[in-house]
């Protein structure tokens, strides 16, 4: 993968859930992963996709501190936008479960994820519906999330191959790494071509607890 020039991003070290960790523990696993990626690729990762898309109140700040350019864990839009924190900014390249191969294919008692397995044709129908909708906008973002042990099975990969051939055959689709897309968004913003939405993080400093509503009390008096 490295030899062929594919981008290597951060996706946790042991698939830990950031939103279940303290800030120091999240930082520890992030640093271990970064060190491992640098060891094998010679450069630091520029992008993150959190395991299971889990995002903590500290994730964005830690990514900025470590020099990350973008995140691709959130699902707040169909197009790229910005995450702004006290530490700086990140480009958010949003994804969604409809382009992830986990829902249609994974059936694992060990992982406590038991779903009816879809046929490759049905899964590709869902993926392609998302792709065609993005393509019709003339500037949409479509990100496939495929796991080697899931989509890599032969019956499924044959359909992935056909889907990619179809995408290439359109002649108007840009195949790019997420880092290239993030750099493109930054340049378009500088040139005034694109004004992405900006989300200020964290949305809330503390857990939001709904106020308990008081039930109206009955007035004392004779029953009717």
Annotate each language-model stretch with its function.
Residues 94-114:
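Glycine-rich, positively charged active-site loop/lid region within alpha/beta enzyme cores that binds
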Residues 1-47, 52-100, 123-144, 152-224:
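Catalytic alpha-helical scaffold of carbohydrate-active enzymes acting on polysaccharides/glycoconjugates
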């Amino acid at each position: 993968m490295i030899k062929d020039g594919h981008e290597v991003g951060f996706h946790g070290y042991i698939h830990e859930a950031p939103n279940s960790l303290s800030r120091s523990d999240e930082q520890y696993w992030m640093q271990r992963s970064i060190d491992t990626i640098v060891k094998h690729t010679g450069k630091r990762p520029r992008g993150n996709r959190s395991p299971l898309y889990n995002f903590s109140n500290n994730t964005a700040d830690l990514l900025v501190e470590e020099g990350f350019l973008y995140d691709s864990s959130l699902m707040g839009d169909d197009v790229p936008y910005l995450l702004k924190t006290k530490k700086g900014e990140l480009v958010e390249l949003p994804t969604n479960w409809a382009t992830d191969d986990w829902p249609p294919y994974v059936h694992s008692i060990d992982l406590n994820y038991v779903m009816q397995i879809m046929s490759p044709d049905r899964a590709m129908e869902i993926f392609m519906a998302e792709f065609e909708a993005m393509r019709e906008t003339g500037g949409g973002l479509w990100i496939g999330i495929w796991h080697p042990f899931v989509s890599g099975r032969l019956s499924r990969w044959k359909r992935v191959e056909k889907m990619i051939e179809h995408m290439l055959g359109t002649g108007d689709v840009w195949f790019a790494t997420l880092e290239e897309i993030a750099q493109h968004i930054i340049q378009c913003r500088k040139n005034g071509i694109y004004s992405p939405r900006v989300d200020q993080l964290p949305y809330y400093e503390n857990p939001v607890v709904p106020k308990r509503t008081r039930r109206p009390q009955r007035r004392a008096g004779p029953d009717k």
